[in-house]
Every structure is written in C-alpha cells, then in structure tokens.
From Swiss-Prot:
<keyword id="KW-0150">Chloroplast</keyword>
<protein>
    <recommendedName>
        <fullName>Maturase K</fullName>
    </recommendedName>
</protein>
<dbReference type="InterPro" id="IPR024937">
    <property type="entry name" value="Domain_X"/>
</dbReference>
<dbReference type="GO" id="GO:0003723">
    <property type="term" value="F:RNA binding"/>
</dbReference>
<dbReference type="GO" id="GO:0008380">
    <property type="term" value="P:RNA splicing"/>
</dbReference>
<dbReference type="InterPro" id="IPR002866">
    <property type="entry name" value="Maturase_MatK"/>
</dbReference>
<keyword id="KW-0819">tRNA processing</keyword>
<dbReference type="Pfam" id="PF01348">
    <property type="entry name" value="Intron_maturas2"/>
</dbReference>
<dbReference type="GO" id="GO:0008033">
    <property type="term" value="P:tRNA processing"/>
</dbReference>
<dbReference type="GO" id="GO:0009507">
    <property type="term" value="C:chloroplast"/>
</dbReference>
<dbReference type="InterPro" id="IPR024942">
    <property type="entry name" value="Maturase_MatK_N"/>
</dbReference>
<keyword id="KW-0934">Plastid</keyword>
<dbReference type="Pfam" id="PF01824">
    <property type="entry name" value="MatK_N"/>
</dbReference>
<keyword id="KW-0507">mRNA processing</keyword>
<comment type="similarity">
    <text>Belongs to the intron maturase 2 family. MatK subfamily.</text>
</comment>
<keyword id="KW-0694">RNA-binding</keyword>
<dbReference type="GO" id="GO:0006397">
    <property type="term" value="P:mRNA processing"/>
</dbReference>
Amino acid sequence: MEEFQGYLELDIFRQHDFLYPLIFREYSXXXAHGHGLNRYMLLENIGYDNKSSLLIVKRLITTMYQQNYLIISANDSKQNPFFGYNKNLHSKILSEGFAIIVEIPFYLRLISSLEGAEIVRFYNLRSIHSIFPFLEEKFPHLNYSADILIPYPAHLEILVQTLRYRVKDASYLHLLRFFLHEYSNCNSLIITNKSISIFSKSNPRFFLFLYNSYICEYESIFLFLRNQSSHLRLTSSGVLFERLCLYRKIEHFAEVFANDFPVIPCFLKDPFMHYVRYQGKSILASKDTPLLMNKWKSYLVNLWQCHFDVWSHAASIRINQLSKHSLDFLSYFSSVRRNPAVVRNQMLENSFLLNNAPNKLDTIVPIIPLIGSLAKAKFCNAVGHPISKLTRADLSDFEIINRFLHICRNLSHYYSGSSKKKNMYRIKYILRLSCVKTLARKHKSTARAFLKRVDSEFFQEFFTEEGGFISLIFPRASFALRRLYSGRVWYLDIIFINGLSNHE
C-alpha cells in the first residue's frame, strides 16, 4: 500500500476522488456510455499471475478501449460472453483490479484514523472468538436482545447511491455502474438471491467492497442514533470513515422520526445498549424494558425504508428475553442462565450459608443444524448415523484419515468455547465412524472386520482426545490445569467460520 500513497496528493480526509481515475479517467466514461461500439469481444485465454499489478489492468483497459471491445447493452447482455458468469479472463482481471484500486483510499484512511491508537497492536481482535469474551462480560447483566438480519438492497443502484454520500467522483460511479450492469439485469426492479449468489462467488472482493460500503453507511447512522440515546459516548465510533453531508442527513432523519413518533419525539436514554455484528447478522442487547427495544426496532425499520429504499418488515427483528431464549449467532446457541452457587460465610462464632445465583453466558453447540451440515456433506444420514463417504480410489489410507482428522480438529477448535462438550463428542463420533466406514468400503470389507484387521496404533492419532495432549506434553500437569482445558477456551486465531459450522 505504501507504493500507492504518492498518488494521493490531497489530504486523504478531504479527497473526493478515488485513486483509479488518475490512471483510467479517460476510459471510464466511454466504458459506461459506449453503446455504439462494435460488438466484438476479446476471448483469448492468456495466462496471468494471480497477483496482477495495476499496470496489467491499465494495459488491458487500453487495449480493449482501442480495439472497441468495451460494450454495454441491455439488449444483448445475456449473449455477452465477456462478462456473463465472469468466467472470462479479462473480466476477472479488470474487476479484481478495480476492487483493489478502490480499496486503497479506504485503507489509508483507516490507517490514518488508527495512527497512534493502541488498538492497532491487538491483531487478535480480528478473531471471531474475540467477540465471545465481550458477550460473557456484558450479556449476563442485560435483559433483552434483538436478533437483527440486515436486509440486502432491493437493487444494485442503491449501492451506487450509497457510495455517492462518501465519494464525489462521477467517473468512479460510471465505471461502477458498468460492472453492476453486466452482473445483473438493470431492468429488473429487484435482485434475486440467485443473482446475488452468482455475483458474490464470481468476484468476492468486488462484492465485499460494495457490501461493506453499504454496511458502513448503515452503521454510521445507527451509531450516531445510538450516541444520541446514551449518556456515554462510544470510543470506537472514531474509526468510521468520513461521510459527506452526514449531519444534514441525520437532521432529516430526526424530522422523519419526529413525524412518525409525534408522542415521543426524543430518544430514550439507555447507557446499557450493546451492539454486535458479524457479516449480515447483528444483535442489539439492552438492560432496559421491551418498550425501548420496540422503539429501536421501529427506528431500524424506518432507517432501511427511508434511507436505503429497502423494504423490511418489523417481523424480521425478533426481540427476546435473554433468560428464556437462545441466540443463534456465530454458529453457537448462546443464552443467559443462572449459575447457582453456595458460599459459606463465618463471622466470629456464627457461620451461615449464602445462596448466590449469578447470571452466566451459556454457549452450546447447535447439534441439529450441525448434523444437517454433516448429512449434506455425506458424512451421515439425516438422523446422524455415520455413513461411508465417496473418495478417490488413488487416495491412500493415511490421506483419508488425515482429511477426516483435519475436519475433526477444525470443528473441535472452533467449538472449544462450548460450555457443554457432549454435543461435540457426538460430532466427533460421527466423523470417526464415517472414516472407518470409508476405509472399510475402500478395502471391500465391513467396519468391524476392518478394525480387527488393522493395527491398534493405526487410528491412535485420530482417536486421541484433545485433552489427552495435555497429559502427553505435561505428564505431571496439575488438576487445575486439566480442568481449565476441559472448560471453555476461546482461540484468537480464528478469522472465519468453518464451512460445516456455517449453517446460517
């Protein structure tokens, strides 16, 4: 990123143009409005390095521009082999280069906003598991939570309009519309889930940039409203990127809310409001009454409808009591449970017992959705009975065991924070027996006969419990150390959810 910093001659907090128009400005307007170009496509499949430089992208755009290969037309969009499903090499280079370039100013703004802050040094905060210690500390003292599913925009043009509040660059918006036009039917009023899935899989970096911009716009307004409703200011809100006309839009929303809620036009003060989000799912928790949660529910619905033109029904936000309902978040079922404890107290000659029942966050492995994921991956049937998995005939026994072992360790690693290990033991049993049946099928035998024939040390590593490694490494490990390992452990090196765990 340092090599591109020289292109940004203006103050990065006052710059309205992205980096790429300095390189591609003369071609972006023609790409978006070139309806009269000849209908020819460049279909040569030329190999290239995945780490394509900006020079390759610039040369590609120059060549396509000079040879009239850039064309956008609503009539022949379905027959256009250049973009289509994004299998064409030049489309991939062009869109990836575009995504890389537009990320640079945001990256530099983030680094500048965090300059000198201690949070930069804590790289472990990137871990998904770093959220759960926060939940363990805050949620036992809260009463209600709102399970929020952030809706997708109804049309890709909304994403372009969202970026207009941050960027004053017409050529940037032209080229952005060019890409979005080829990935979807612009004449359609809505985006189907299928088109979103194709778009996200064909160019994940480009899709994540647009989606993160949409989420950043939504959270910048939401956190502003949250700050108005709290006596305490958020320290993390300073990381948000600069927005154009932010406060003018907030004043407009204040008028909208005042008109929609004439009886209570002001915000209710709540110093115990907490917000957590991962991808498109978020949780809003509070210690106050359900009245405040329902008011926030109305705020969010009006925010999506008035600002993003996204229809969201109030039923999409579920308000539950933490002590009676579980939260399905980050592939865990989390709930607040009372942890009864008896404390013996003695004063002089008198002794008495105190019954204490503090709240505790309970995290459980979602066994039914996880078995459904294993059944979909052909490790078991719908009721959880292990079955043999089809494998290539050229795989050795060691490679098959190693693959099953890798899956088992990943799941055990991710669900190490579960407060009850019984469900995880069942998942391990399914994977282990599926491995045995797979090997028995390969050797044209039964599972029982195969286990009798092989050496006892053949599955030693696979059947060794993770807790046994403590005894192997530290033979004289104390009881407290082993008890600590058998409890909940949150790892700070997990940056994504396992595919089998991601049942959302």
